[in-house]
Amino acid sequence: MTLWTIKIGTSLLRGNKEFSTNKIIETYCGFIAESKAKGDQVIIVSSGAVGLGCNRLGLKVRPNDLNSLQAAAAVGQGYLMSLYESAMKKYGYNVAQILLTRSDFESKRCFKNASLTIKKLLDWKVLPIINENDSIANEELRYGDNDTLSALVSTAISADQLVLLTDIDKLYSSDPKFDKDAKPITDVHSSNEIIQIQSNSNESNNWGTGGIKTKLTAAQIATKNGITVHLADGREPKILKDILKGSRGGTVFHPNPKPIGTMKSWLAHALYPQGTLHVDDGAYNAIQNKGASLLIVGIINIDGDFAKNQPVKIVNLEGIEIAKGISSISSESIRRFINNRIKSTQYPVVVHRDVLVLSSELLI
């Protein structure tokens, strides 16, 4: 049994001269039903609500302001779900809508609840359809792309494979639309390779919010958690059938043999730091090389305001980020200590090692 996450991009659901949006979804769902029938589990992360909403409203150009985008998403999301429901009903499967925002992942409790809900739906042989909650999320709560969301969901449910269906056939060394010497990249084996790949392609067309960079970010998140990622051209729907049967996508991002684990992935990728802790060389060495927690005495400066148990990033004297974690002490209390520099034989822990992830752990 394989647990699949399939991300379907906006550009694939707009329809074209050959296939309507309805036909495209029906085709994908047919392949998914085949996979489920042989015992696999599948979830879909589907874009398209804004694009379909614009289409139904007769808008020829995608709006730029957030309120218009949210209104279009509200129109399109219901229609999008009706297409999936109709397509899967033919094969005897129910579908479930799950709308998420960044805040759902920033709370450890909500993060766990979301994963448990998805797993229960899978136990019931339901097909979860996940999308960002575009209709209510403000700029601070939005991921802005479903590539990152698909990787975080895959991590939360411990998926085996993530398929990113898009409108390119594979990853290239540069944008082949503008560079005739662009070389195809069929395999990527580490996060370092992902970081080193320089893509000069346009970030998106005007109907989508994801681009090559967001797909690289998604691949980095997923592979660090032991998940194989396929980047494939969804304009040829049959490629999904082939991948679900064991073939490969145009580019395969191979999983890290030593996953960092759900907790560290949550700390590194799901949380938005509310402040920055500047540490001295002693604290840097203790954190980086000795596996220690961050004590308050090692903090020399602080940026931002945050409450107890909120996420922070930790930087060295050069301002380079070295870690992220959860602060057990508020910014107000830390500033009070810095201003007074109270001497003690036992200083409190600000970020415990159990809720800290090193930046270097993400570069392997």
UniProtKB/Swiss-Prot annotation:
List the SUPFAM superfamilies: Carbamate kinase-like, PUA domain-like
Binding of ATP, residues: 7, 166-167, 209-215
Database matches in Pfam families: AA_kinase, PUA
Which EC number applies? 2.7.2.11
All residue ranges annotated as the PUA domain in the record: 274-349
User: Which compartment or compartments is the protein found in?
Assistant: Cytoplasm
Q: In which pathway does it act?
A: Amino-acid biosynthesis; L-proline biosynthesis; L-glutamate 5-semialdehyde from L-glutamate: step 1/2
**GO CC aspect terms:** cytosol
Q: Which GO terms describe its biological process?
A: L-proline biosynthetic process
| UniProt GO MF annotations | ATP binding; glutamate 5-kinase activity; RNA binding
| Signal sequence coordinates | none
Q: Which reaction does this enzyme catalyse, per its entry? A: L-glutamate + ATP = L-glutamyl 5-phosphate + ADP
**Residues that, per the record, bind substrate:** 47, 134, 146
Keyword annotations for this protein, in alphabetical order, are: Amino-acid biosynthesis, ATP-binding, Cytoplasm, Kinase, Nucleotide-binding, Proline biosynthesis, Transferase
Q: Give the family from UniProt.
A: Belongs to the glutamate 5-kinase family.
What this chain does, per the entry, is described as:
Catalyzes the transfer of a phosphate group to glutamate to form L-glutamate 5-phosphate.
Q: PANTHER family annotated for this entry?
A: GLUTAMATE 5-KINASE
Full protein name? Glutamate 5-kinase
Q: Which organism is it from?
A: Prochlorococcus marinus (strain SARG / CCMP1375 / SS120)
